[in-house]
C-alpha cells in the first residue's frame, strides 16, 4: 500500500505571470476568424520559451476588416502584421495574400507586457523581433 498523499502545492494558489520583456518563441497557430463584433481578424498564438506552462501560449489579434473599425485601427493592425512577418523573416510585398499558414512554426522574439483584464493580470504581445542569426564567427575565450 502506498503512503503517497496527493496534496495542494504552493504554486496552486499563487499565479504570477512572467516578467515583462523579450522571450524567444515560435508561432504555434495562425488562422482567420471573426471578432465578437463580427470583424475579420487574424489570431496568432505564440509558444513562449522559459515560462511557466500556464503562460506558455499567448494570443495576439490583428483586426483587419470591419465596418465598425476606424481607418486608423485597421492601419495599425496591418502595420503590426507586417512587423510580425518581417520578424519571422518573411518579407511580403504589396498585393501578396495574407497567408496565416506560412507563419506557423516560425521562430522569433516576442515582447510581452502585463495587462489588467477582468481583475486578472495577463500577458499582452506588444512587439516582435527576429531571432539573431548565427554570425559564423567563433567567440574567443
Where on the chain are the PLM-derived regions?
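Short beta-rich binding modules
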Residues: 1-141
